[in-house]
A protein has these predicted regions:
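Conserved acidic, metal-coordinating active-site core of Asp-based
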Residues: 2-5, 12-21, 26-87
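Mg2+-dependent phosphoryl-transfer enzymes with acidic/Ser/Thr/Gly-rich catalytic loops
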Residues: 56-129
Length: 129
């Protein structure tokens, strides 16, 4: 057997089918299409952009918005989003955000360059509608 294997484990099991109360998008900036989708999402649920998430960032944001980790949805756009994905009740990632993110995600969307972030945000909009 060559090489090492890495296994990703989630902090919370995904058994909750309730809509999220908080959506965290790991991104520094948004394109016009992404901004439009994010504005719609923000009108329906607490939604924040987190460019460089720190350890425990999701727990801090959940506490600030009176929610739990199980009530949070995360969209990871790069490898920096992995800690958020592992704690979130709903974990979404974009293709190209890193193998670990794709493995930890409930759903993987197209790359950002192909409209994946806007599609992921629109997906969460449907969850909270």
């Amino acid at each position: 057997m060559s090489g090492s294997s890495v296994r990703m484990y989630r902090a919370t099991p995904r058994t909750n089918s309730a809509p999220p109360k908080l959506v965290v998008v790991e991104s520094e900036c948004l394109s016009p299409d992404e901004r439009t989708a994010f504005a719609l999402l923000s009108s329906r649920v607490a939604a924040i952009l987190v460019p460089c998430p720190a350890q425990g960032e999701l727990a801090i944001q959940c506490q600030a918005h009176s929610g739990s980790l199980n009530q949070a949805a995360v969209i990871a756009t790069s490898q920096r989003g992995l800690p958020l994905l592992l704690e979130a009740g709903i974990a979404l990632a974009l293709r190209g955000a890193g193998y670990e993110n794709e493995a930890a995600a409930d759903m993987v969307f197209k790359p950002r360059s192909s409209g994946g972030l806007a599609a992921a945000i629109e997906y969460v909009c449907r969850l909270v509608a």
